[in-house]
């Protein structure tokens, strides 16, 4: 099915991508904020962010603010295209099921 993306379709990854998509015009989302938005645990969020980064859908940056580590994530151009394609495909499936 064109547009359907197995990487994004996993429920937590879909929530992560939705949050990154919504924040795309602003600064990257900090790990703690993304964790709160998605309801993920530290380990789950880290693992799924790594999978999205490996697919080229998310860019992860790590730095320090003072002495505290900071991890942030942003959607990439490829991630934006994949997310839009996937959500368009889901929308079409839902509309077909309603008809």
Residue ranges of predicted features:
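N-terminal helix-turn-helix DNA-binding core of bacterial DNA-binding proteins
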Residues: 4-41, 65
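Histidine-centered active-site/metal-ligand motif
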Residues: 9, 48, 86
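Canonical helix-turn-helix DNA-binding module
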Residues: 32-62, 67-68
